[in-house]
A protein has these predicted regions:
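Glycosyltransferase donor-sugar binding loop
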Residues: 39-45, 216, 244-259
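Aromatic "clamp/platform" in nucleotide-sugar-dependent glycosyltransferases that forms part
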Residues: 278, 297
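Short hydrophobic beta-strand element within catalytic cores of glycosyltransferases
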Residues: 314-318
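Acidic anion/phosphate-binding donor-loop and adjacent secondary structure
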Residues: 149-153, 180, 194-211
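Conserved donor-binding/catalytic core segment of Leloir-type glycosyltransferases
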Residues: 4, 205-224, 230-233
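A conserved mid-protein helix/loop that constitutes part of the nucleotide-sugar donor-binding site
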Residues: 16-24, 220-238, 245, 258
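Conserved acidic donor-binding segment of nucleotide-sugar-dependent glycosyltransferases
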Residues: 319, 329-331, 335-342, 350-356, ...
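Nucleotide-activated donor-binding/catalytic signature segment of Leloir-type glycosyltransferases, i.e.
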Residues: 258-277
Length: 392
């Protein structure tokens, strides 16, 4: 059976959560006997940050051999940003217009890959397949975020296109009701992300010379909001001189990164708050962590949070944050607090002064992630894909 994973987005060297999920799905489905291909859209050439298994064919829609190379170009990017200033919906339509140029290339990918099923990783990708190409190949559309965040400013044509999906997958049970507000659709399926737990268990209650609060995620203000963590830590840093904050993640949002660095300097935290960038050695990060701090505004099913909890690190998040407020159970595997630096600071301090509490809730965190074991999640996907083929 031929399976095409479609993610029309930058992919070369990009360390996003969606790309991480795609890499894992490619490996899991290949192990289950599928012939897997991947199509992405990137003006750059090179390798993905998260490697694909040997034997998985990777197509770049913008650089298809023997076909016209597509350039999004500075003009298109500028037009998109101008549109965004007036309407997020207009900006997304502008984004789609770039992919719409690539219809011949996408048709060529379908001819070469001959998929029995396509899994679409982003809404504009699904729109191109289901509206632009009107393909009869069954498409499973993945929703990688809170539907309120996805669809509030989504173009109507994008929503109508997604309604042609064979199935739409959501990451949390509560997301089905949210998605139903925007889509006239009744074939939603809940499958969470898999939690890949390395062969290690950490002890967040152990004695160390330096204790660490860790945050992992791209450094960006609208979603991940690392500035709140810095503000929270600044309130208690002098009380806990043997504690540091390590922030791991892509720093492509240069304006926000500059603001974060300024905030660190303003509070005199240069020696204890560090922007570490990206890494492929997460085991070492987890072994050094005592608390996982996650001040996100909204999430779909955060890989970093779930993996930190899976190795036994207690977490702090906001009760208002979608997905986080379902993964973290207050005082069972972490703390859920009202949004804001003050409450976040108090929760951090509760953990920082009590090693046994960290150890106890860390054990709870590890236990709570077991239902998301890879074999359970990928078996669910295998069943769903085969259901699509059976319905043909």
């Amino acid at each position: 059976m031929n399976l095409l994973l479609a993610d029309l987005h930058k992919f070369v060297g990009y360390s996003g959560g969606i790309e991480h999920v795609l890499s894992r799905m490619a490996a899991a489905m290949k192990d289950r006997g599928y012939t897997v291909s991947v199509v992405m859209a990137d003006e750059k050439s090179g390798d993905p940050f998260y490697p694909l298994p040997e034997g998985v064919k990777l197509y770049n829609l913008f650089k298809m051999e023997g076909m016209t190379e597509i350039h999004a170009g500075l003009f298109s990017k500028a037009a998109r940003e101008i549109a965004r200033a007036f309407s997020k919906e207009a900006a997304r339509n502008r984004n789609y217009s770039i992919f719409n140029q690539a219809k011949p290339q996408m048709k060529r990918v379908l001819e070469l890959a001959k998929p029995h099923v396509i899994v679409s990783f982003r809404e504009p990708t699904g729109r191109l397949l289901l509206e632009g190409l009107d393909t009869e190949i069954p498409v499973i559309s993945m929703l990688h975020n809170d539907p309120d965040e996805i669809f509030l400013h989504s173009p109507e044509k994008e929503k109508r296109a997604l309604e042609k999906s064979r199935f739409i997958q959501v990451l949390m049970p509560s997301f089905i009701e949210k998605a139903e507000k925007y889509l006239d659709y009744d074939r939603f399926v809940h499958i969470p992300n898999s939690v890949n737990i390395p062969h290690l268990e950490v002890d967040p209650g152990q004695e160390r010379k330096v204790h660490k609060i860790v945050n992992v995620g791209r450094v960006t203000g609208r979603t991940k909001r690392q500035h709140i963590l810095i503000e929270a830590f600044s309130k208690i840093a002098q009380e806990f001189p043997d504690w540091e904050v390590d922030i791991w993640g892509d720093t492509y949002d240069k304006a926000y990164v500059t603001m974060v660095k300024s905030l660190i300097s303003k509070n005199g935290l240069q020696d204890c708050v560090h922007l570490r960038g990206t890494t492929k050695s997460m085991g070492k990060v987890w072994q050094e962590a005592d608390i996982f701090a996650f001040p996100s505004h909204h999430e779909g099913f955060p890989l970093a949070l779930s993996e930190a909890m899976g190795v036994g690190i207690p977490a702090v998040g906001f009760a208002s944050c979608s997905s986080v407020n379902e993964l973290i159970k207050d005082q069972v595997n972490g703390f859920l607090v009202p949004d804001g630096a003050e409450a976040f600071s108090k929760a951090l301090a509760s953990f920082m002064k009590d090693s046994e509490l960290r150890r106890k809730l860390g054990t709870g965190a590890r236990e709570s992630m077991k239902p998301y074991a890879p074999e359970v999640v990928w078996d669910s996907w295998d069943k769903l894909i085969k259901e699509c083929i059976k319905e043909q």
